[in-house]
């Protein structure tokens, strides 16, 4: 048994812990209530929260207050327009390590908002600096450009894009440092001038977007690469559009798209502002002018010829000529970036194409300007057409943008017109007769169905009348009526049901039909007969049928068993005890040996009997002759033993000589064949000498 644990009893409310007596008898321990445990947990959590607040507010061990590490975010146009300043969160959910000191070269140390930096940002935003005004004006002018690039997925010079995101959105602190503002304004100016997107690696996960700002040296190197690749990109854009879109419809479709995307006043203002800002950047202009001159040499041929054809005969313009002309204007070495263009670039393609087209129109003083202006005016007039045509133009442009030239499919061999159907041949006389017969049968059936419908209508009306008349019987006295008697015969005919009359008519007609057998039709069909004039072959005709009278079962009688009856001396137990002489003992042993030999002989004979019945009879005679001397010897010995000592012997009825002289007769009995197990048992008993002697059944009889 486990010993009981002594425990303190529960005290009452008024008692103290010291007054409670120690019990002599052990009791169960007191269980604490769940409410007390919950109260302890609440008190502990409140203490921990207070300690956390103290650590955050006063710092840990005299160090600076804990500030979450944040990275700067790309400044968007909407934030510049609204001039929003986002403060850092007051208290993070989990305390973090104190921020390491960083050098002045990195932009992260400048842009991260700490305790002092947040105040500086507020002061800078309150007092609008001239640099900030320029920045906001530039962003307002390029609102549409920033809207198209809100995804902030920026290209790396190698042509790849890296996008990562963090969990929480970070506030963008702008206006606090003039160096950062200058860099941002330079990048925006480059965007307006038609350069690539700002060279910043955006790191974006599913929830948050941050940027890794680079040093000035890296930025200068990347800017040079982008400027060198700028003209090649414009060439690739122009050539790709010239490959897919016909030159006659190029300007019209671009004008329609710009009209749909942006209103005409806004588009003009944006283009004028962008051109004004490009004039300020002299370095970019020098590079562009050199590249544009090379473009002008290749483009005029592709613009002049199809434009004239389109104005004069737009419907008869063949597709093959335009494709050949476009191939001439293509550059031999397109840039790699035109091949691996992202979907964002494909969306911005119409804007860049419009800008490049405007620049070419101003600087190229060739007669192509007149044709392009006329087509642009026509496109503005056609912009008011229904939306179905615009959608068709878009679908055509999308198909051509994929690089598939739209050509009308003209089959080599057109199908011939089918002639009139062949006139059917006249049917034979038998078919015509069969068709007439079917037609007559159908007409007869149709007439019968109409007659039955008329008869049924009359029957319904007559049934209603007869029921009404039967209900009125006895109410009105008529001539010839007797109270309690049947109605007169004239009335009875009228009051009869039509069904009864119809049944009477059918019964009379059936009687007449049965009386005269001539009215019945012979419905029997002729017997199906085979072809005549052919005979069976002689082999089949001369065959004789074999009649088997016997069933095929035969009865055979044979002897399966044989019984041989022999007399034998049986000794009782008392007699054996009395006669213990050696002579008698030897004689009994000799007799047993002789009996065993005889049994073996009999077994051999039984095995040979199964072969042939004749051999069995011969062997039986031999055995009888051989057994006679043996039996005589036995009789002599028995007489000697009887003369020597009196022995009680159970002898069957009749003398021994009669029994011995009688030959075994052949008897057939209906005995079941013993099983193999029984045979083995009998053999074992015979060998051991335990089998009953052959004289015992005679004693029983």
Swiss-Prot record:
Residues 203-236, 266-294, 306-319, 375-397, 404-414, 445-455, 494-503, 619-642, 676-688 have a biased composition (Basic and acidic residues). Residues 589-599 have a biased composition (Acidic residues). The keyword Cytoplasm applies. InterPro entries: Aim21. It comes from the Eukaryota. This is Altered inheritance of mitochondria protein 21. Its main location: cytoplasm. It comes from Candida glabrata (strain ATCC 2001 / BCRC 20586 / JCM 3761 / NBRC 0622 / NRRL Y-65 / CBS 138). The keyword NADP does not apply. GO terms for cellular component: actin cortical patch. Residues 237-247, 347-359, 504-519, 652-670 have a biased composition (Polar residues). Residues 1-35, 53-177, 203-546, 589-701 are annotated as: Disordered. It is found in: Cytoplasm, Cytoskeleton, Actin patch. Residues 524-537 have a biased composition (Basic residues).
